[in-house]
């Protein structure tokens, strides 16, 4: 199944380091970030999961649950978490999904249908496409997707920025411009007429071109 933005995130049941979950129920009425990695006990992934552990409070503030995934079993995750805390300085307090039968990785199109049904004997190179991020909204639809090569660690500060943009634009008829950060000016989307925009933004807007209408970020 090919997944795209606005596809419904595949639901699944799985074991995690914090017990079994049913994914959609686990998300509840908030947001979620599902991020995967090719294999436990690998160097780049160790730095990524450690950084995400330190950043978790920022996701908590934004009503967003985070969950890791690899095709290794949960027992391996638990052992590896000790290394992550030792080397990266942050305890992993979010759940990590064990996917030894490759069901979740296949459902999320990170591995092809012909990848098999077991992670046994698979190397990190075999799982090279399993370094992805999915931002999922309260409606269980995919709002954003990112996939990185094995050789490049992800920028989770950018994932947080992307989440903030997704949350803002889900509530207001605006878009965020290049390199936008929370609190900076935004753009009124073309679907909003000038007449409707006047009602929403009585203070007006800057418009270097008719199609480029810039306003202060709406407040929640």
Enumerate the predicted regions with their spans.
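Chalcogenol-based redox active-site neighborhoods
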Residues: 1-220
């Amino acid at each position: 199944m090919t997944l795209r933005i606005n596809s419904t995130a595949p639901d699944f049941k799985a074991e995690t380091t914090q017990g079994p979950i049913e994914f959609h129920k686990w998300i509840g009425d908030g947001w979620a970030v599902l991020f995967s990695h090719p294999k436990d006990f690998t160097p780049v992934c160790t730095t990524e999961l450690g950084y995400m552990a330190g950043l978790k409070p920022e996701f908590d503030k934004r009503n967003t649950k985070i969950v890791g995934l690899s095709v290794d079993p949960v027992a391996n995750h638990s052992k590896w978490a000790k290394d992550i805390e030792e080397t990266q300085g942050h305890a992993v307090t979010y759940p990590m999904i064990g996917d030894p039968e490759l069901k979740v990785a296949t459902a999320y199109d990170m591995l092809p249908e012909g990848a098999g049904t077991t992670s046994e004997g698979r190397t990190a190179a075999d799982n090279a496409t399993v370094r992805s991020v999915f931002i999922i909204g309260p409606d269980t639809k995919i709002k954003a997707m990112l996939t990185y090569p094995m050789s490049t660690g992800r920028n989770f500060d950018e994932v947080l920025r992307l989440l903030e943009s997704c949350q803002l634009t889900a509530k207001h008829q605006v878009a965020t411009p290049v390199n936008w950060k929370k609190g900076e000016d935004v753009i009124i989307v073309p679907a909003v007429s000038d007449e409707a925009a006047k009602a929403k933004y009585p203070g007006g807007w800057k418009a270097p071109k008719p199609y480029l209408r810039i306003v202060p970020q709406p407040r929640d």
